[in-house]
Amino acid sequence: MCIKEAVVKRFLQLCRERGIRPNQLATLSGVTPSTVYSMLDPSRRDVSVVTIKKLCDGLELPISEFFSGPIFDGLEQEIR
C-alpha cells in the first residue's frame, strides 16, 4: 500500500469511528468538501501535509497520533 492509500484509509476509519461523513469532516476542519473528496479520489496521487494537518485539527487528533497506526507500517517505497 502506498502512503496516499494509507492516508485515505485512515481518514475513512476515523470518520467511521466518529460517525461523520466526509463533508462533515470538511466543515469541522475549515476546508471545502471538494478538498476532502479530492483527497479521497483514488485517481489523485498527492495529498498535502497541510490538508492532513487541517483534517486532524478538525478531528481534534494530533498528527502524530494520526500516523501512529498499523496501517502505516510496511508502506511501499514511493520512489520508483
Language model features with spans:
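Short, basic-rich loop-to-helix N-cap that marks the start of a DNA-contacting helix
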Residues: 43-57
